[in-house]
Structure formats: C-alpha cells, structure tokens
Design a protein with these regions (language model features):
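N-terminal post-signal-peptidase region of extra-cytosolic proteins
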Residues: 40-45
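Extracytoplasmic/periplasmic, Sec-exported soluble proteins
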Residues: 38-39, 50, 77-81
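Short glycine-/acidic-enriched loop or helix-start segments at secondary-structure transitions
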Residues: 22-23, 47, 69-70
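Structural motif
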Residues: 4, 47-50
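Local sequence-structure signature of Cys/Sec-based thiol-disulfide redox active-site neighborhoods
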Residues: 3-36
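Structural micro-motif
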Residues: 50-61
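Non-catalytic, surface beta->alpha helical segment in thiol-disulfide oxidoreductase systems
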Residues: 60-97
Length: 97
C-alpha cells in the first residue's frame, strides 16, 4: 500500500494488457506516494501525451512534473528495482525540507 505524504508525488505505471505478464507488482509496495496504473491500449491519449514508447514504463511525478522515468528493455521487462524507484521518491521528499 502506498501512503500519501505531504507532497503530490505520484508514480504511474504505463503498460498494456498484452504485456500484463510484465506488470511491475512491487509498485504497490512503494511508500510516500500515490500510485496509478494506466493501460495504454485502453487510454491511447495517455501514451501520446507522455511519449510512452515501450511498456512497462514507470514515471515519477512531483506536483504534476515528470521527475524520473524507468523504461523496459527490449524484452518488455523493466530492469529498475523497487529500491531504485523508492530512492527517487525519498530524494524528492528530502529536497522538500
């Protein structure tokens, strides 16, 4: 479960139904953020708006601004770890103080 902190940090995982075997399950374990999942096949405008070229892609937003992006490799599997993404979230929070 992701607990919402004082900032507006949001982590969005973009994927597609045909690639559901590569969903990033640990996203739900991130803390101090809001989490969302967008299926780009169901919401193609989101794919265009955020220039999603490969799935899955995880984007960290702070107050609506993209801070960091993690993209899958050629095998459609993401190489970033939960620790990598959480470190960016923690850094964003630390910089707010």
């Amino acid at each position: 479960m992701c607990f919402f902190a004082h900032s507006q940090i949001e982590v969005i995982q973009y994927n597609a139904g045909w690639n559901s075997s590569n969903d990033v399950q640990w996203c739900n374990d991130l803390i101090d953020c809001e989490i969302d999942y967008i299926d780009i096949a169901a919401k193609p405008k989101q794919q265009v708006k955020y220039k999603i070229e490969v799935v899955p892609t995880i984007i960290i937003f702070d107050d609506g601004e993209e801070i960091e992006r993690f993209e899958a490799d050629i095998s459609f599997a993401i190489q970033a770890t939960e620790e990598d993404v959480q470190a960016y979230i923690d850094e964003i929070l630390a910089n707010k103080f």
